Swiss-Prot record:
Region annotation Disordered: where it falls in the sequence: 137-166, 254-297, 403-512
Gene for this chain: FH10
Regions of compositional bias (Polar residues) in chain numbering: 139-152, 279-293, 502-512
Keywords: Membrane, Signal, Transmembrane, Transmembrane helix
Name of the protein in question: Formin-like protein 10
Amino acid sequence: MDGLCYVIFIIFSLLSCAFSPLSYASPATFSRRHLLQAPVTDPSTFSPPFFPLYSSTSPPPPPSPPQPLPPPAPTFATFPANISALVLPRSPKPQTPSRTLLIPAISAVLAAATLIALAFFFYGRWRGQTSHFKDESKSLASDISQSQQQTLPCPPPRNNNTQNKLSVAPSTSDVLYLGNVVTSSGSGFVKPESPDISPLPPLPARSFLLQHHSEANLDEEEEDDDFYSPLASIAGQESRDRRINPYSNCSCSISSHSDSPAMSPSAAMSPPMNSTAPHWSTNQNTHSPSSPERTVRNNKRYGGQSLRMFSLWNQNLGFPRISSASTSPERGMIRTPDAYARSSMYSSVSTTPDRFFRKVLDSSPPRWNDFSRNVKSLFLSSTSASPARDFCINISESSRSLKSSWEKPELDTTQQRESAAAAVTLPPPQRPPPAMPEPPPLVPPSQSFMVQKSGKKLSFSELPQSCGEGTTDRPKPKLKPLPWDKVRPSSRRTNTWDRLPYNSSNANSKQRSLSCDLPMLNQESKVLDPRKSQNVAVLLTTLKLTTNDVCQALRDGHYDALGVELLESLARVAPSEEEEKKLISYSDDSVIKLAPSERFLKELLNVPFVFKRVDALLSVASFDSKVKHLKRSFSVIQAACEALRNSRMLLRLVGATLEAGMKSGNAHDFKLEALLGLVDIKSSDGRTSILDSVVQKITESEGIKGLQVVRNLSSVLNDAKKSAELDYGVVRMNVSKLYEEVQKISEVLRLCEETGHSEEHQWWKFRESVTRFLETAAEEIKKIEREEGSTLFAVKKITEYFHVDPAKEEAQLLKVFVIVRDFLKILEGVCKKMEVTSSLA
């Protein structure tokens, strides 16, 4: 109506501009006709035009008071003599205005008439379409209400105060679903008795438009009774014209219907309003067009209420879950934990669900862009995925943006809302219906979107071997056996293994039952040290004899049958005195069984003085090898002494060095250590060392083979090199150990005779074999002692030969051989140098 009034105002303005030239034409013509007769007057006396030139918004200035006209001059008519010749003045005929002024006026009138006709035509067409949509929505509402009455038993309708008021449900009891149409004139939403939901047939596309409360008072109801959702309240704050848009202004209890299962943003996202919300009647807003300030105030009040209701709904319900378009109507509803216990919401089946929902999102207000953009992105992704997949819409970010945009208007109108809320009488709250048992909560899938690729999925048996095997292709490192025979058997040091309790990897000892502490059948006892037991186990694996054979060889004293290695292993695993007592105390009839290694040692303990026998037999078996080693060492030292005394070449080198080193030539001797410094001392010519000049003289005297003779000195004194590697103190220690071992063997025989085992047959064999050994051992020891004395005498003689005091070198008797070894290395280097120079010459 405002637009129509604006068009009519423009038409009248055009008409006034068109007729204004005619009004200006009549006074001009009048003045032209009476120019000769009328007196000259002031131009201010003319009357203003009919349509003033002032703006329509400001009133014209008041007219000036009329001024009195001056009295006309008296004129007397003079008549000539010939009165017949008198010509009386006649007024000419009025001339019609020019045709050029009529053409614009006629065209302006025609244009105004055309605009008026077009305005009435479009207005009538708009009224016709609106009434047609109202009829369809009313018929659809009646059909759906009949179908609901037939399918679902409903309780009696609730009482409403007025027809034009919105029926409001409690926020905690009812939740509206798609497919239900609730008008203000009808009863409120009815909760079905059964939680099962029956699908509805497809609905026409045009039923998405809003239903208004009456046809007679359409304009007044649009201005007075506006029901706001969070989306509609935003639109109402922007402009008054946006409030008329049916897509942006939606009631909380009106469900939009279309052939799409997806909800419109305004209907789906509007929260259930509280039953205590104020009802606004038509009488409160009858003067809203004439009072724009009140309209803005009402809009802010509605926006604040819808904001509070939307924030409460968002906290109670959380994130709504909307399923994508499918053939089942149950997949297109919002599912929340409270919705299952309260009511059901139906959604229609659509053949093109995404296209219509995108149109609705495009027509939404700009402040809902966050939510629209979120829903569009989900619909675009749902087209590529399976239609039966579920997806979630996150409206937390949209609610935050809406809250930030609404906080400032709420702060400005806080006092107005408080005064308005105090003035409105609130109806008593309705009793909520009994709650139904809640089903188990739905667990969202871990992956909201999943694209199914064409192809057969491989089972676990069909997977490639590389997926399960991992690193089986790598070659495993070869494990080496742990040398347990190198572990000391009688270690008295405490370490980490000794501090750990036995079987510490099991459960706590306090939690064990009493049966675990009792001895069980075939339970092995751990008497020996773990390391010692492991050594015995390794020995048994390498043993080629049985336990009885080993015991018999120990009784008879046959050390050849056992061997040195076996005897050494038995000597290392000798148990301590406590372990021997424990092993002897065990009997064969005992419930607790011994380990194989402990059983082996227990059988060995049946032999008297078994481990002393082992030591004695080990000494007997290794005696010959030790004697041979000592004899070889003594013979090498004696041969080295003879070689040093009888070497002609060594004597020539020492004499030539003595002559070249002393300028006077009267030197008689020098210390043997001086041979090592001949390389560093220059000769008389000052160009070469003394050793170089001595070797050169020897080669010249011997001829061509002289250099080769000097080099062969190293091979002649080879025994001296070997003697230098020996340690005379170690040799003498080995001799003393050998003598002690023989003494231990004789002690074993003495112990056996004292204990009374000498009459036994087994002991007699052992004693016979040991006595024979002692006889041969005594003779060999005497020989070793004689060789040791002769060797010591030869070393002292050769030391004195090279002018070394043997008393000072008693700690290092073999030092002479060490000096000779080092001198031979220097001599070989000089010979190689001379060969190189001779070859170049």
